[in-house]
Amino acid sequence: MILNGPGISYTEPDIGSEFVPPLPEHPREAIVKLCEHCTNRLLHRDELLGYEYWSFAEAATDEQAEVLCKMKMRRPYTLPEMAKLTGMPEADIEKMLDDMSYTGLLEYNWENPERAKQWVLPMLVPGSAEFLNMRVSQLEEHPVYAKFFEQASKGPLSKATPMVPPGGAGIGMHVIPVEKAIDASSTSVPIEHIEHWLDKYDGKYAASTCSCRASRRVMGEGCADDPADWCIAVGDMADYVVETDRGHYVTRDEVYDILRQAEDNGFVHQITNIDGENKIFGICNCNVNVCYALRTSQLFNTPNLSRSAYVAKVEKDKCVACGRCVEVCPAGAAKLGQKLCSKKAGGQVPEYPRQELPDATKWDHTKWSPNYRNDNRIETHESGTAPCKTACPAHVAVQGYLKLAAQGRYDEALALIKRENPLPAICGRVCNRRCEDACTRGRVDAAVAIDEVKKFIAQRDLDAATRYVPPVVTPTRAGGFDQKIAIIGAGPAGLSCAFYLAEKGYKPVVFEKNERPGGMLTYGIPSFKLQKDVIEAEVEIIRLMGAEFRYGVEVGRDVTLDELREQGFKAFYVAIGCQGGRLAGIPGEDAEDVTVAVDFLREVNSGKIDALPGRTIVVGGGNVAIDVARNACRLGSEHVEMFCLESEAQMPASEEERREAVEDGAHISCGWGPKEIHLDEAGRVCGITFKRCTRVFDDEGRFAPEYDENDLRRVDADRVVMSIGQSIVWGDLLAGSKVELGRGQGALADPQTYQTAEPDIFVGGDVYTGPSFAIDAIAAGHEAAVSIHRFVQPGSTLTIGRNQRRYIALDRDDVVLESYDNASREVAHVDREREKAAPFSEYVETFTEEQVRAETARCLGCGASIVDPNKCIGCGLCTTKCAFDAIHLDRDRPECSTMVKYEQKLPSLGKYALKRAIKIKFGRK
């Protein structure tokens, strides 16, 4: 049931017989009795017998099962008591008890005045179902234990969950907030603090394997976390897990380190909740994508099973919709919405829907969220949020870094940008600025100069003293992962993938056939737009993070994929870009003076062309054609002219690009297609004839040019550069692989995971999309890193619980903007003297600090995070991510700190169920 595959989605299965393995024809009676003895199904009697039977059948002998059936659940027995109960000699029964404890059928403690060892038959969850999953070697030998734990933590609760009161009624686990989120609270009580429990069990801690992570991994639904050492046993349980090879002792400082790393990764702190307010035996650090305890509230939409006494609240005036709280929220309680007033809402900020709760409503499976692991990762309310973040392919937190820059917090602004874009200094120079096209401020006067602010912030990366090298945040206690990953191509997609894999704790190896990194950034974009030292500076940061770069290596020629597999590489990210060009298929184009744009730009950027006399004709109307034309002008061509099929309004090149080309001296002729290149007697280019293009696209928007063959124009030329498309040069890279190619020889892959038909090969950037922009490749590289991390970790799914990246822009026609005054947009200074002196140097200056302050003040602050209190479980993780002090925990639900013993669950359930029934019957709230 491994879910590593393209296009796979997963929904929690309904509880039904199809998921229960049948009993054997002649079941072992002792095991059947043990199943009946151990399971309290509340309102479900039969669903678990199959998994229970097979798990207990593998875990216990008949003799052991008979002994277990004589023990009362959760009642401690000393050795003399067990000898008396079973009639066995103490030595014999002690060995059996120790054997069953080692397996996980029993636990033990010394909780009596004499500190005598006593054995306990635990409940299934939390209890023996977990213990059976906590030793990885045992679990791999008995994989049925994984499904037993999964079902035992769900089936018995399915009808009881709506009746669970605040505090959890002694069932399972209980969220305990991040300590620093409530350390200033004057109303908190001791049991709400992790420090209280660490003090209570001071000096008695052990780190152990997370049974949920281990179980899900065996089932093929893992989240790619390393299961080891996330759970902290306290008190006598620490001795139990150490003595039964389930964990190892840790110091208090090590506990703090585990808790800190858990918070960095967005894991929820939970404590056991079956022994009342005077005892716990474990602190877990839970990933909602695999945690069975959090599932009890999330699947059934019954938050009382998890929530703490606290609720997150947003101060909208401080919130900048950066999305950090949304990304980390395990319950999907935080989503991005808007801060601006809405016309549809009567000139007010919109009201947002809240999750229905079972408190006064009939509750059945139609109220559940079977796909909660994905649904909780949807980031935006349907009515939308800040258009800038939505429009950016990488979904950079634009509003957030503008605010940080406005406050002079440049280091934090750079860190925030790099959460989604590892190449901000590059993008600050070459991005196509879709965020600015979408900017709401453009409806008032002019869009905020977002890219110029980003460029200013990212200048810090060009100086070793101020650059930002992100820390490794890895979901393993081992310090990092040792799986070898190969990235083929050091363009923007490959660099992005390397960055985010390194940030996750890998040491990726980047293979680049050229002698320098950057791909088309280095060999395609003119240096007067993007200086090569900018690229080198940002690549150096990726190297410092742990990535290795091997230049001058062409995979497929110098080393094959199979040879890399033999060297231990477990996954490949192929991001070689579109390094070839296309010709028009016309007479004369095979002449020496006819070239394609990518080759021309590569030669210029490699220093192989330092002068270009004569007349240069460029065929094409995109941004690459513009780059060719501007290079030709700066290299001394006496006449440079571009010819394109499209009208001026249809030209792919942006208006700004066209203007800059004209300023450089290029001429642009629209509506012409190449017909024939003319050669002189020596075979050199002397001219080119164009024919009038009457239509570029058909009625359905497909590229289908038509021409007037009688309307011709001949122009003199000394060289022709074709910029009418790019191609992928695969070479022998994919030889022998199962990777399938589609239109334009682009690789076919799953649109979410980027996994190809060859499971260990992922693709991204231009080899998947066709020629596009750097920011698109950067976004793809980030997502590929997520997929590859999941792929190389055993038993992990590529799809379950991923951030969905479904950002929706607010309706700019609906927002109320009349109260905003006009404020002119800042413009970067252009140093024409420097441009004349050094035509290939960067001549557009970076904003000054004063300009940054003025420009960031123009941001309207469109977006805000919205917290649904009905979904919030009060974990406090959101508070650890917010750089703006905009979200806090309030103790609005003190009743949720009511901790009772498991034995009190039925009275607790009954009392609450009665109140609930009255509310439902009489329609009270």
Which sequence ranges carry the predicted segments?
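Ferredoxin-type iron-sulfur electron-transfer modules and their immediate structural context
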Residues: 33-35, 56-57, 196-199, 203-320, ...
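Short acidic, hydrophobic short linear motifs in intrinsically disordered regions
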Residues: 74-86
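Short amphipathic alpha-helical interaction segments
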Residues: 86-102
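A short, conserved structural fragment
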Residues: 101-112, 334-335, 887
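Short, amphipathic alpha-helical interaction segments positioned at domain boundaries
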Residues: 115-154, 909
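Beta1-alpha1 glycine-rich phosphate/pyrophosphate-binding loop at the start
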Residues: 396-399, 405-406, 447-451, 487-555, ...
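Glycine-rich dinucleotide-binding loop and its adjacent helix/turn
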Residues: 457-478, 504, 537-557, 581-635, ...
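A Rossmann-like FAD-binding core segment of flavoenzymes
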Residues: 533-582, 595-612, 634-744
